[in-house]
Amino acid sequence: MATVESGPDALVERRGHTLIVTMNRPAARNALSTEMMRIMVQAWDRVDNDPDIRCCILTGAGGYFCAGMDLKAATQKPPGDSFKDGSYGPSRIDALLKGRRLTKPLIAAVEGPAIAGGTEILQGTDIRVAGESAKFGISEAKWSLYPMGGSAVRLVRQIPYTLACDLLLTGRHITAAEAKEMGLIGHVVPDGQALTKALELADAISANGPLAVQAILRSIRETECMPENEAFKIDTQIGIKVFLSDDAKEGPRAFAEKRAPNFQNR
């Protein structure tokens, strides 16, 4: 399997069963770059294809999560040119997790600003942790730009309609406390502790049966917005495969023997 290489704009680190992806342009508040997104796509592929990776964390360096598009760089070339020259392609969409969801849990560990594309990437994650001073917002409309990371479609599916419209149409920024109250994030921790909390969550997830975790995640996604009677058919099909696995035998056996289970992902 190909190794994911870290680069100046993004760092990739393996800790146990968890892959940590760090956006690494702190001088630009971790604004997105072509190189950063290339490495991120490689990392997503690694998470999906490496059976020993059970969880992934996305974070940012230097006390920033991600400021989205590099607006200063955009002054060198009209933003619309990327649609003409082909630079806005599938790899960029994949990096932003637009239309792509990982097969394993993805946790966001947010410190500082997660603005525009930063909040858009956030919506592609499953569990979200933020330092108490973190800021969120989808501010593209302020600069007569459009949220190409998918927020006009998926934000309203994640928080109440009127709150989604408020954020999208005013472009205002909100605090971590407000984001938690809206349901955009799940955990608020002291500043500097977001990654620590994310690692705790990743360890808890990785200790569970990987087949069960991935199946639950798949069922959540595949049945989203479906009528229950249709969703339960898919839910049952996915669940039966888990019950037929070797790990489904190991779990109850470990419980009966009062020991930690040794799951083999099969």
From Swiss-Prot:
The modification N6-succinyllysine is found at residues 135, 142. It catalyses: (22E)-3-oxochola-4,22-dien-24-oyl-CoA + H2O = (22R)-hydroxy-3-oxo-chol-4-ene-24-oyl-CoA. It is an enzyme of class 4 (lyase). Keywords: Cholesterol metabolism, Lipid degradation, Lipid metabolism, Lyase, Steroid metabolism, Sterol metabolism. SUPFAM superfamilies: ClpP/crotonase. The keyword Lyase applies. Disulfide bonds: none annotated. Pathway: Steroid metabolism; cholesterol degradation. Disruption phenotype: Not required for growth in a mouse tuberculosis model. Not required for growth on cholesterol. Changing residue 142 to E: About 50% succinylation in vitro, reduces specific activity 7-fold. Homotrimer; substrate probably binds in elongated tunnels between the subunits. NCBIfam families: PRK07799.1. This is Enoyl-CoA hydratase EchA19. The lineage of its organism: Bacteria, Bacillati, Actinomycetota, Actinomycetes, Mycobacteriales.
